[in-house]
Amino acid sequence: MGLLGSVVLGVSTVAPVYCLTATLGPTVTAVGVRMPAVFLAGFLPMLLVAFAYKELNKDFPDCGTSFTWTAKAFGPRVGWMAGWGLTVATIIVLSNLAGVATEFLYLMLGEMTGSGWVADLDRNTAVHLLTVVLLIAGATAMSYRGMTATKWFQYGLVGLQLAVLLLFAAIAVGKAAAGDLPDSIGFSFSWLDPLQVGSFSAFTAGLSLSIFMYWGWDTCLTMNEETLGSAKTPGRAAMISMVTLVGSYLLVAIAAQMFAGVGTTGTGLGNPETADNVFAALARPVLGSPWSILLFLAVVASAAASLQTTFIPVARTLLAMSAYRAVPPRFGAVHPRFRTPGYATVAAGSATAVFYVGMSLISENVVEDTILALGLMICSYYALTAFACVWYFRRSLRTSPRDLLLKGIAPLLGGLLLSGVFLQTLTDAWAPDYGSGAVLGVGSVFVIGVGILLLGALLMTCYGLVRPEFFRGETLRKETPALVMED
């Protein structure tokens, strides 16, 4: 896989159209018209952390990425928790992707057939859950066969997403500039100033959402052994993916805000009734009929593409953890024909389906709370990786100004920023009114987020008692050579 394929992989995993429809509304609710500023601010810590990934990958291109690098820098237990954070974050994202894909699939079919009955099928719990499970099974099967077999499929889906976003933004800006929309607002450069956000708490709430929007760009690094020029190409691909994402996010955020405004009624981006699915509300007003189908199709394509590629980081992380004896050996099984971590892929798919069905049957609000808690997982393992870079290269930081900046200062700042978001989110989530409810007076998002991290610590402790080799530092040390998947 070359540079283009790696970039497509990174963008595909992030699923820009899905991220935008899911986060435009909540971000406006948190910070109002400063939404573009928060998207830009969320890019900064991710860019700084990207330097850490790039330098670590150049020195040690291992498919375990965060798990391997953090273990080498800080020891096996910290590395194990970084791997756990990535694994759990992936399962939460995968389950939500399947849910959004199902919703838009029936909306698209309803729009195509002109049937409200078809569009409303998603409201039937049994139909919804069955469709979600089928989508997860299909994505698992495609990931099981490997990226090479579906390369052109991914190219097409990513190209469709970016083309529809450009079309949507152009038409939205054009209609807003015409001046005949009641809720439209004129562009102001103050929208790009994060210092004008009302409060630090509101800023971190919006920042947590924007960080989620960039999650997954590092997927191209987990396939570094299968990439041409594995020392440099994955790092370059990660950077190009990041720039592509921030450009498309800013363009669509500004266009949507100009067209719909930030009001709490009608098509306003702050309307609580449409906040979790903005494109469903804006598709027809912006694109008109029948072209609104394109936006529904783009969301389905975005979720479908990401469903397949998002299995890659978790499967390869589990493969690496198995190779270093941090998890049971069967997770390291590689399919003899497709050369993919088959057992880990199927296990991730099964866990995703069970998680989504279980959470949905408990309460729809619980699903939403797990998404809010996702920011804690993302910030934790990205920050650990950034700090790992600084510590790993600490003896070579004085070699040149470049090394000091890219291996030291930039990753350190990125790690500190993400740690700040983590701690502020943790503080806010403690409040009983944060999320859908409270448990013993503590916000449900705090309970879920901290509970998942504590569950990881418990599993790590139990496995360490059964198979202590990894935790004694016998299987993975700083001098251990990189794990390579042989063809």
Model-predicted segments: where are they?
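Terminal cytosolic tails of multi-pass membrane transporters
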Residues: 1, 386-410, 428-487
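Membrane-interface "cap" regions at the ends of multi-pass membrane proteins
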Residues: 1-24, 29-33, 47-51, 463-487
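Extracellular loop-to-transmembrane helix junctions
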Residues: 19-127, 244, 444-457
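Helix-loop-helix junctions that connect adjacent transmembrane segments
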Residues: 35-36, 113-127, 155-293
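Helix-loop-helix connectors at the membrane interface of multi-pass transporters/channels
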Residues: 68-71, 99-127, 159, 164, ...
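TM-loop-TM module centered on a large, flexible mid-protein loop between adjacent transmembrane helices
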Residues: 68-70, 75, 107-112, 190-193, ...
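Membrane-helix boundary/coupling elements in multi-pass transport proteins
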Residues: 85-100, 214, 218-227, 289-329, ...
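Membrane-interface loop-to-helix entry segments
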Residues: 129-182, 238-242, 377-382, 392, ...
